[in-house]
């Protein structure tokens, strides 16, 4: 709340995580949709807590958002992903790790987070909260432009002291 007091654009939204109603990690998608309801801009930048974008990519991102804001054919932007593994110096590029993913989507009511909030899809059903975030029928992928920018994913990395304590 201290950060919110100094930065008025930050809004803290208190929620309840209902894992019974939204099973199989779809509660992440439901919570993403809940946050989306509080957004007001043309584009939504979505990062999970273990993801960051280096500031060197900000000019590319800003330029693309400005260039395509009036082009309704573009519904989102795809980023390359670097998955750090074990520590902060090693990257895993095996087939088990997604090399690209959407992290910017248009702020449209028919665009919803999908599955476990890994990506976004257009849903023909425009409800605020969907009964099943894993359904493919009646949905489609967003039309997207790939950016020359990366998301660094640290979900599988640990501080060296933590890794050394495992020995």
Regions from the PLM with identified roles:
Residues 48-52:
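The conserved acidic donor/metal-binding loop of glycosyltransferases
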Residues 38:
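Conserved catalytic core of Hanks-type protein kinase domains
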Residues 44:
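Short aromatic/hydrophobic "clamp" motif used to bind/position activated sugar donors
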Residues 25-33, 54-167:
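Catalytic-site signature of metal-activated, phosphate-bearing donor transferases
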Residues 1-23:
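Acidic donor-binding segment of Leloir-type glycosyltransferases
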């Amino acid at each position: 709340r201290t950060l919110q007091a100094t930065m008025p654009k930050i809004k803290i939204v208190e929620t309840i995580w209902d894992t019974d109603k939204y099973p199989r990690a779809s509660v992440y998608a439901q919570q993403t949709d809940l946050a989306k309801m509080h957004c007001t801009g043309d584009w939504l930048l979505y990062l999970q807590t273990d993801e960051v974008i280096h500031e060197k990519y900000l000019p590319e991102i800003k330029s693309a958002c400005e260039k395509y804001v009036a082009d309704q054919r573009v519904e989102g932007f795809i980023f390359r992903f670097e998955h750090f593994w074990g520590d902060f110096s090693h990257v895993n590029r095996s087939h088990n790790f997604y090399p690209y993913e959407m992290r910017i989507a248009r702020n449209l009511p028919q665009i919803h987070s999908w599955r476990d909030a890994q990506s976004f899809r257009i849903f023909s059903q425009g409800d605020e909260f969907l009964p099943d975030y894993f359904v493919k029928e009646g949905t489609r992928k967003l039309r997207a432009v790939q950016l020359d920018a990366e998301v660094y994913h640290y979900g599988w990395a640990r501080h060296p002291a933590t890794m050394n304590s495992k020995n």
